Curated annotation (Swiss-Prot):
Lineage of the organism: Eukaryota, Metazoa, Chordata, Craniata, Vertebrata
One Pfam short name: BRCT_2
UniProt region (Disordered), positions on chain: 1-21, 199-245, 279-309
Record's protein name: Telomeric repeat-binding factor 2-interacting protein 1
Function statement: Acts both as a regulator of telomere function and as a transcription regulator. Involved in the regulation of telomere length and protection as a component of the shelterin complex (telosome). In contrast to other components of the shelterin complex, it is dispensible for telomere capping and does not participate in the protection of telomeres against non-homologous end-joining (NHEJ)-mediated repair. Instead, it is required to negatively regulate telomere recombination and is essential for repressing homology-directed repair (HDR), which can affect telomere length.
Species: Bos taurus (Bovine)
Protein backbone atom coordinates (compact mmCIF):
# COMPACT_ATOMS: atom_id res chain seq x y z
CA UNK A 1 0.00 0.00 0.00
CA UNK A 2 2.89 2.36 0.82
CA UNK A 3 4.35 1.69 -2.61
CA UNK A 4 1.02 2.46 -4.22
CA UNK A 5 0.79 5.75 -2.36
CA UNK A 6 4.29 6.69 -3.59
CA UNK A 7 3.30 5.92 -7.16
CA UNK A 8 0.17 8.02 -6.77
CA UNK A 9 2.06 11.21 -5.85
CA UNK A 10 2.19 14.06 -8.34
CA UNK A 11 5.83 14.16 -9.54
CA UNK A 12 5.45 17.84 -10.30
CA UNK A 13 3.91 18.75 -6.95
CA UNK A 14 5.74 20.63 -4.16
CA UNK A 15 8.21 18.45 -2.23
CA UNK A 16 9.73 20.96 0.18
CA UNK A 17 9.22 20.98 3.94
CA UNK A 18 5.76 21.88 5.21
CA UNK A 19 7.45 24.11 7.85
CA UNK A 20 9.84 25.90 5.48
CA UNK A 21 8.13 29.26 6.03
CA UNK A 22 7.39 28.79 9.74
CA UNK A 23 9.40 30.83 12.24
CA UNK A 24 11.19 29.36 15.24
CA UNK A 25 8.38 30.50 17.53
CA UNK A 26 5.90 28.46 15.48
CA UNK A 27 4.24 31.41 13.74
CA UNK A 28 3.82 31.43 9.97
CA UNK A 29 5.62 33.92 7.75
CA UNK A 30 3.10 36.13 5.95
CA UNK A 31 3.63 37.09 2.30
CA UNK A 32 2.06 39.61 -0.04
CA UNK A 33 2.57 38.70 -3.71
CA UNK A 34 2.13 41.39 -6.35
CA UNK A 35 -0.09 40.30 -9.26
CA UNK A 36 2.05 38.50 -11.84
CA UNK A 37 2.01 35.38 -14.05
CA UNK A 38 3.97 33.55 -11.34
CA UNK A 39 1.60 34.44 -8.48
CA UNK A 40 -0.31 31.14 -8.59
CA UNK A 41 2.82 29.01 -8.42
CA UNK A 42 4.38 31.14 -5.69
CA UNK A 43 1.18 30.97 -3.63
CA UNK A 44 1.18 27.19 -3.86
CA UNK A 45 4.82 26.96 -2.75
CA UNK A 46 4.27 29.39 0.14
CA UNK A 47 1.16 27.66 1.49
CA UNK A 48 2.77 24.22 1.14
CA UNK A 49 5.70 25.50 3.18
CA UNK A 50 3.48 26.62 6.05
CA UNK A 51 3.40 30.30 5.12
CA UNK A 52 0.31 32.47 4.77
CA UNK A 53 -0.85 34.96 2.14
CA UNK A 54 -2.46 38.37 2.53
CA UNK A 55 -4.53 40.14 -0.11
CA UNK A 56 -3.18 43.58 0.78
CA UNK A 57 0.13 44.88 2.12
CA UNK A 58 0.00 44.32 5.86
CA UNK A 59 2.48 45.25 8.61
CA UNK A 60 5.00 42.47 9.13
CA UNK A 61 4.26 40.77 5.81
CA UNK A 62 7.06 40.01 3.36
CA UNK A 63 6.31 41.96 0.18
CA UNK A 64 7.22 39.98 -2.95
CA UNK A 65 7.68 41.30 -6.49
CA UNK A 66 9.44 40.14 -9.62
CA UNK A 67 12.82 41.70 -10.46
CA UNK A 68 12.44 44.50 -12.98
CA UNK A 69 9.19 45.93 -11.62
CA UNK A 70 9.99 49.64 -11.50
CA UNK A 71 7.55 50.58 -8.73
CA UNK A 72 8.70 47.74 -6.49
CA UNK A 73 12.40 48.43 -7.01
CA UNK A 74 11.94 52.15 -6.46
CA UNK A 75 10.25 51.66 -3.09
CA UNK A 76 12.96 49.41 -1.67
CA UNK A 77 10.34 47.57 0.40
CA UNK A 78 10.00 44.49 -1.80
CA UNK A 79 11.81 41.15 -1.80
CA UNK A 80 12.50 39.31 -5.06
CA UNK A 81 10.18 36.38 -5.85
CA UNK A 82 13.39 34.42 -6.47
CA UNK A 83 13.64 34.17 -2.67
CA UNK A 84 10.74 31.70 -2.61
CA UNK A 85 12.15 29.64 -5.49
CA UNK A 86 15.61 29.44 -3.90
CA UNK A 87 14.23 28.53 -0.47
CA UNK A 88 12.19 25.74 -2.06
CA UNK A 89 15.11 24.56 -4.19
CA UNK A 90 17.45 24.30 -1.19
CA UNK A 91 14.65 23.38 1.21
CA UNK A 92 15.92 25.89 3.77
CA UNK A 93 15.00 29.38 4.91
CA UNK A 94 17.39 31.93 3.41
CA UNK A 95 18.31 35.48 4.40
CA UNK A 96 15.62 37.90 3.22
CA UNK A 97 17.86 40.95 2.89
CA UNK A 98 19.97 39.23 0.25
CA UNK A 99 16.94 39.36 -2.03
CA UNK A 100 15.76 42.91 -1.39
CA UNK A 101 14.90 44.77 -4.60
CA UNK A 102 16.23 48.25 -5.18
CA UNK A 103 17.34 50.63 -7.94
CA UNK A 104 20.24 49.29 -10.00
CA UNK A 105 23.65 50.97 -9.43
CA UNK A 106 24.06 54.05 -11.66
CA UNK A 107 27.46 52.87 -12.97
CA UNK A 108 26.05 49.58 -14.24
CA UNK A 109 25.01 49.26 -17.86
CA UNK A 110 23.51 46.04 -19.13
CA UNK A 111 25.44 44.64 -22.13
CA UNK A 112 23.56 44.80 -25.43
CA UNK A 113 22.71 41.51 -27.07
CA UNK A 114 21.71 40.74 -30.61
CA UNK A 115 19.03 38.03 -30.89
CA UNK A 116 19.66 37.71 -34.64
CA UNK A 117 23.22 36.56 -34.05
CA UNK A 118 22.26 34.24 -31.22
CA UNK A 119 19.67 32.43 -33.34
CA UNK A 120 22.41 30.53 -35.16
CA UNK A 121 23.97 29.27 -31.98
CA UNK A 122 24.97 30.25 -28.47
CA UNK A 123 27.91 32.63 -28.42
CA UNK A 124 30.72 32.48 -25.90
CA UNK A 125 29.27 33.34 -22.53
CA UNK A 126 30.01 36.77 -21.12
CA UNK A 127 29.64 37.64 -17.43
CA UNK A 128 25.89 37.62 -16.80
CA UNK A 129 24.19 40.75 -15.49
CA UNK A 130 22.88 40.24 -12.01
CA UNK A 131 19.84 41.64 -10.34
CA UNK A 132 20.15 43.86 -7.29
CA UNK A 133 19.31 40.81 -5.18
CA UNK A 134 22.42 39.02 -6.47
CA UNK A 135 20.56 36.59 -8.73
CA UNK A 136 21.55 36.19 -12.37
CA UNK A 137 18.95 37.23 -14.90
CA UNK A 138 18.22 35.30 -18.09
CA UNK A 139 19.98 36.57 -21.22
CA UNK A 140 18.97 36.00 -24.83
CA UNK A 141 21.76 33.42 -25.01
CA UNK A 142 20.16 31.51 -22.14
CA UNK A 143 16.75 31.65 -23.79
CA UNK A 144 18.05 30.36 -27.12
CA UNK A 145 20.00 27.59 -25.40
CA UNK A 146 16.93 26.47 -23.45
CA UNK A 147 14.63 26.53 -26.48
CA UNK A 148 17.19 24.63 -28.58
CA UNK A 149 17.69 21.99 -25.90
CA UNK A 150 13.95 21.46 -25.50
CA UNK A 151 13.51 21.25 -29.28
CA UNK A 152 16.19 18.56 -29.54
CA UNK A 153 15.54 16.51 -26.42
CA UNK A 154 11.85 16.78 -25.48
CA UNK A 155 10.14 13.61 -26.68
CA UNK A 156 6.62 14.66 -25.73
CA UNK A 157 4.64 17.45 -24.10
CA UNK A 158 4.70 15.61 -20.77
CA UNK A 159 8.51 15.60 -20.71
CA UNK A 160 8.44 19.41 -20.86
CA UNK A 161 6.17 19.66 -17.81
CA UNK A 162 8.06 16.91 -15.96
CA UNK A 163 11.39 17.27 -14.14
CA UNK A 164 13.78 14.78 -15.79
CA UNK A 165 14.40 16.92 -18.90
CA UNK A 166 15.29 19.96 -16.81
CA UNK A 167 17.55 18.09 -14.41
CA UNK A 168 19.45 16.70 -17.40
CA UNK A 169 19.67 20.23 -18.80
CA UNK A 170 21.17 21.46 -15.53
CA UNK A 171 23.75 18.63 -15.50
CA UNK A 172 24.82 19.59 -19.02
CA UNK A 173 25.78 23.06 -17.67
CA UNK A 174 23.82 24.66 -20.49
CA UNK A 175 23.31 27.78 -18.38
CA UNK A 176 24.27 28.81 -14.88
CA UNK A 177 20.67 28.69 -13.68
CA UNK A 178 19.03 25.93 -11.63
CA UNK A 179 16.77 23.45 -13.40
CA UNK A 180 13.75 24.83 -11.54
CA UNK A 181 14.49 28.34 -12.82
CA UNK A 182 15.01 27.14 -16.41
CA UNK A 183 11.79 25.13 -16.32
CA UNK A 184 9.85 28.09 -14.95
CA UNK A 185 11.42 30.39 -17.53
CA UNK A 186 10.44 28.11 -20.42
CA UNK A 187 6.88 27.39 -19.28
CA UNK A 188 6.08 30.99 -18.35
CA UNK A 189 8.02 33.03 -20.93
CA UNK A 190 9.46 30.96 -23.80
CA UNK A 191 6.94 28.28 -24.72
CA UNK A 192 5.09 29.32 -27.87
CA UNK A 193 7.57 32.15 -28.53
CA UNK A 194 10.12 30.09 -30.48
CA UNK A 195 9.50 32.08 -33.67
CA UNK A 196 10.90 35.20 -32.03
CA UNK A 197 14.29 33.53 -31.82
CA UNK A 198 14.22 32.39 -35.45
CA UNK A 199 13.92 28.80 -34.31
CA UNK A 200 11.46 26.18 -35.46
CA UNK A 201 8.31 25.23 -33.61
CA UNK A 202 8.50 23.21 -30.41
CA UNK A 203 8.57 19.39 -30.74
CA UNK A 204 5.42 18.26 -32.49
CA UNK A 205 3.57 15.15 -31.45
CA UNK A 206 -0.11 14.21 -31.24
CA UNK A 207 -0.11 14.85 -27.50
CA UNK A 208 1.62 18.22 -27.84
CA UNK A 209 -0.88 19.27 -30.51
CA UNK A 210 -3.74 18.43 -28.12
CA UNK A 211 -2.01 20.37 -25.36
CA UNK A 212 -1.57 23.35 -27.69
CA UNK A 213 -5.25 23.34 -28.63
CA UNK A 214 -6.17 23.07 -24.96
CA UNK A 215 -3.86 25.99 -24.13
CA UNK A 216 -5.53 28.15 -26.76
CA UNK A 217 -8.90 27.45 -25.12
CA UNK A 218 -7.58 27.99 -21.59
CA UNK A 219 -4.49 30.29 -21.66
CA UNK A 220 -4.45 30.67 -17.85
CA UNK A 221 -4.08 26.94 -17.39
CA UNK A 222 -1.31 26.89 -20.01
CA UNK A 223 0.66 29.58 -18.15
CA UNK A 224 0.59 27.52 -15.00
CA UNK A 225 2.62 24.79 -16.71
CA UNK A 226 0.37 22.14 -15.32
CA UNK A 227 -0.72 19.22 -17.52
CA UNK A 228 -4.43 19.29 -18.33
CA UNK A 229 -6.74 16.38 -17.69
CA UNK A 230 -7.14 14.36 -20.86
CA UNK A 231 -10.58 14.42 -22.37
CA UNK A 232 -11.79 11.58 -24.53
CA UNK A 233 -13.06 13.31 -27.68
CA UNK A 234 -15.64 10.71 -28.67
CA UNK A 235 -17.44 10.56 -25.33
CA UNK A 236 -20.84 12.27 -25.10
CA UNK A 237 -20.93 15.29 -22.79
CA UNK A 238 -22.92 13.48 -20.09
CA UNK A 239 -20.57 10.48 -20.05
CA UNK A 240 -17.55 12.75 -19.92
CA UNK A 241 -18.95 14.60 -16.90
CA UNK A 242 -19.48 11.29 -15.11
CA UNK A 243 -15.95 10.22 -15.97
CA UNK A 244 -14.57 13.55 -14.80
CA UNK A 245 -16.44 13.37 -11.49
CA UNK A 246 -15.13 9.85 -10.95
CA UNK A 247 -11.56 10.99 -11.64
CA UNK A 248 -11.91 13.98 -9.31
CA UNK A 249 -13.49 11.87 -6.60
CA UNK A 250 -10.50 9.55 -6.69
CA UNK A 251 -8.16 12.53 -6.73
CA UNK A 252 -9.89 14.15 -3.75
CA UNK A 253 -9.69 10.96 -1.71
CA UNK A 254 -6.07 10.40 -2.69
CA UNK A 255 -5.06 13.95 -1.88
CA UNK A 256 -6.87 13.88 1.45
CA UNK A 257 -5.06 10.70 2.47
CA UNK A 258 -1.79 12.22 1.26
CA UNK A 259 -2.49 15.48 3.06
CA UNK A 260 -3.44 13.65 6.23
CA UNK A 261 -0.21 11.64 6.18
CA UNK A 262 1.88 14.76 5.72
CA UNK A 263 -0.12 16.86 8.17
CA UNK A 264 -0.25 14.33 10.98
CA UNK A 265 2.70 12.07 10.00
CA UNK A 266 0.78 8.95 10.89
CA UNK A 267 0.61 5.54 9.23
CA UNK A 268 -2.44 5.06 7.02
CA UNK A 269 -4.17 1.68 7.15
CA UNK A 270 -4.48 -0.49 4.06
CA UNK A 271 -8.07 0.67 3.63
CA UNK A 272 -7.87 4.42 4.37
CA UNK A 273 -11.34 5.73 5.08
CA UNK A 274 -10.50 9.30 6.08
CA UNK A 275 -13.13 11.52 4.49
CA UNK A 276 -13.33 15.29 4.63
CA UNK A 277 -16.47 16.57 6.34
CA UNK A 278 -17.15 20.13 5.27
CA UNK A 279 -18.97 22.11 7.95
CA UNK A 280 -21.46 24.38 6.20
CA UNK A 281 -22.17 26.60 9.22
CA UNK A 282 -20.60 27.64 12.51
CA UNK A 283 -23.12 25.93 14.80
CA UNK A 284 -21.90 23.73 17.62
CA UNK A 285 -20.97 20.19 16.58
CA UNK A 286 -23.62 17.55 17.09
CA UNK A 287 -23.68 15.97 20.52
CA UNK A 288 -24.11 12.24 21.15
CA UNK A 289 -27.61 12.95 22.48
CA UNK A 290 -28.64 14.58 19.19
CA UNK A 291 -27.48 11.53 17.29
CA UNK A 292 -29.09 9.03 19.66
CA UNK A 293 -32.13 8.58 17.43
CA UNK A 294 -29.98 7.19 14.63
CA UNK A 295 -30.09 3.40 14.49
CA UNK A 296 -26.77 1.55 14.97
CA UNK A 297 -27.15 -0.19 11.61
CA UNK A 298 -27.54 3.13 9.87
CA UNK A 299 -24.44 4.53 11.60
CA UNK A 300 -22.35 1.59 10.48
CA UNK A 301 -23.68 1.98 6.96
CA UNK A 302 -22.80 5.68 6.88
CA UNK A 303 -19.30 5.02 8.17
CA UNK A 304 -18.68 2.37 5.58
CA UNK A 305 -19.80 4.39 2.58
CA UNK A 306 -20.23 8.07 1.82
CA UNK A 307 -23.19 8.79 -0.42
CA UNK A 308 -22.65 10.00 -3.98
CA UNK A 309 -24.43 13.35 -3.37
CA UNK A 310 -22.12 14.07 -0.43
CA UNK A 311 -19.05 13.30 -2.50
CA UNK A 312 -20.39 15.41 -5.35
CA UNK A 313 -21.08 18.33 -3.03
CA UNK A 314 -17.58 18.12 -1.53
CA UNK A 315 -15.98 18.01 -4.96
CA UNK A 316 -18.05 20.99 -6.11
CA UNK A 317 -17.05 23.07 -3.10
CA UNK A 318 -13.37 22.19 -3.45
CA UNK A 319 -13.50 23.01 -7.15
CA UNK A 320 -15.07 26.39 -6.41
CA UNK A 321 -12.32 27.24 -3.93
CA UNK A 322 -9.62 26.09 -6.36
CA UNK A 323 -11.04 28.36 -9.06
CA UNK A 324 -11.74 31.29 -6.73
CA UNK A 325 -8.23 31.42 -5.27
CA UNK A 326 -6.39 29.93 -8.26
CA UNK A 327 -4.90 27.12 -6.15
CA UNK A 328 -4.28 23.41 -6.70
CA UNK A 329 -6.15 20.51 -5.12
CA UNK A 330 -3.45 19.71 -2.56
CA UNK A 331 -3.36 23.25 -1.16
CA UNK A 332 -7.14 23.47 -0.79
CA UNK A 333 -7.49 20.07 0.91
CA UNK A 334 -4.60 20.90 3.26
CA UNK A 335 -6.42 24.09 4.20
CA UNK A 336 -9.62 22.13 4.96
CA UNK A 337 -7.70 19.71 7.18
CA UNK A 338 -6.04 22.52 9.12
CA UNK A 339 -9.40 24.24 9.64
CA UNK A 340 -11.33 21.13 10.80
CA UNK A 341 -13.29 20.98 7.55
CA UNK A 342 -15.07 24.30 8.24
CA UNK A 343 -15.98 25.94 4.95
CA UNK A 344 -16.14 29.54 6.16
CA UNK A 345 -12.89 29.28 8.11
CA UNK A 346 -11.12 27.56 5.22
CA UNK A 347 -12.32 30.15 2.72
CA UNK A 348 -11.17 32.97 4.98
CA UNK A 349 -7.80 31.27 5.50
CA UNK A 350 -7.23 30.86 1.76
CA UNK A 351 -8.23 34.46 1.10
CA UNK A 352 -6.41 36.29 3.89
CA UNK A 353 -4.09 33.76 5.50
CA UNK A 354 -6.08 33.67 8.72
CA UNK A 355 -9.43 32.47 10.07
CA UNK A 356 -12.37 34.85 10.28
CA UNK A 357 -12.67 34.25 14.04
CA UNK A 358 -9.05 35.24 14.60
CA UNK A 359 -7.97 31.88 16.03
CA UNK A 360 -4.91 30.07 14.58
CA UNK A 361 -5.08 26.97 12.39
CA UNK A 362 -4.38 23.51 13.80
CA UNK A 363 -0.88 22.08 13.56
CA UNK A 364 0.37 18.52 13.95
CA UNK A 365 1.64 19.31 17.47
CA UNK A 366 -1.77 20.69 18.44
CA UNK A 367 -3.41 17.44 17.34
CA UNK A 368 -0.89 15.43 19.34
CA UNK A 369 -1.63 17.57 22.40
CA UNK A 370 -5.34 17.05 21.80
CA UNK A 371 -4.86 13.30 22.18
CA UNK A 372 -3.23 13.66 25.60
CA UNK A 373 -5.31 12.87 28.67
CA UNK A 374 -4.01 15.93 30.46
CA UNK A 375 -6.28 18.63 31.84
CA UNK A 376 -3.58 21.31 31.75
CA UNK A 377 -2.81 20.59 28.10
CA UNK A 378 -6.50 20.62 27.23
CA UNK A 379 -6.97 23.95 29.03
CA UNK A 380 -4.06 25.39 27.05
CA UNK A 381 -5.70 24.30 23.80
CA UNK A 382 -9.01 25.85 24.86
CA UNK A 383 -7.21 29.09 25.62
CA UNK A 384 -5.45 28.98 22.24
CA UNK A 385 -8.37 27.91 20.01
CA UNK A 386 -11.50 28.54 22.08
CA UNK A 387 -13.73 25.85 23.60
CA UNK A 388 -16.00 25.68 20.56
CA UNK A 389 -13.12 25.14 18.14
CA UNK A 390 -11.60 22.45 20.37
CA UNK A 391 -14.94 20.62 20.43
CA UNK A 392 -15.17 20.88 16.65
CA UNK A 393 -11.66 19.55 16.25
CA UNK A 394 -12.43 16.52 18.41
CA UNK A 395 -15.58 15.83 16.39
CA UNK A 396 -13.70 16.33 13.11
CA UNK A 397 -10.97 13.87 14.07
CA UNK A 398 -13.56 11.27 15.05
CA UNK A 399 -15.04 11.44 11.57
Amino acid sequence: MAEAMELGKDPNGPTHSSTLFVREDGSSMSFYVRPSPAKRRLSTLILHGGGTLCRVQEPGAVLLAQPGEAAAEASGDFISTQYILDCVERNEKLELEAYRLGPAPAAYQAPETKPGVLAGGVAAAEPEPQSQAGRMVFTDADDVAIITYVKEHARSASSVTGNALWKAMEKSSLTQHSWQSMKDRYLKRLRGQEHKYLLGEAPVSPSSQKLKRKAEQDPEAADSGEPQNKRTPDLPEEEFEKEEIKENEAAVKKMLVEATREFEEIVVDESPDFEIHITMCDDDPCTPEEDSETQPDEEEEEEEKVSAPEVGAAIKIIRQLMEKFNLDLSTVTQAFLKNSGELEATSSFLESGQRADGYPIWSRQDDLDLQKDDEATRDALVKKFGAQNVARRIEFRKK
